[in-house]
């Protein structure tokens, strides 16, 4: 006879896919002058946070990176966080 385990059967856990914060009707525009918005996408070490963590779409991630680099060049954001 086959043994039946007494452990409950678990359903697989599916994490809900995050949506891009820059896509949609009321989404903020990516602008190099908006330092507060850009700082949310920079790590404590001063690196640009990858899109797999922030759930930003590929197109908007490129725009975001370009805006951060432009703000750094103009002196609005630091290159190195001290």
UniProtKB/Swiss-Prot annotation:
UniProt entry keywords in alphabetical sequence: Ribonucleoprotein, Ribosomal protein, RNA-binding, rRNA-binding
InterPro entries: Ribosomal_bS18, Ribosomal_bS18_CS, Ribosomal_bS18_sf
Record-level GO BP terms: translation
An MF annotation (GO) of this entry: structural constituent of ribosome
A Pfam family hit: Ribosomal_S18
Keyword Transit peptide carried by entry: no
Subunit structure: Part of the 30S ribosomal subunit. Forms a tight heterodimer with protein bS6.
Purpose of the protein: Binds as a heterodimer with protein bS6 to the central domain of the 16S rRNA, where it helps stabilize the platform of the 30S subunit.
Family: Belongs to the bacterial ribosomal protein bS18 family.
Family matches, as NCBIfam families: S18
Name assigned to this protein: Small ribosomal subunit protein bS18
Origin species: Rhizobium meliloti (strain 1021) (Ensifer meliloti)
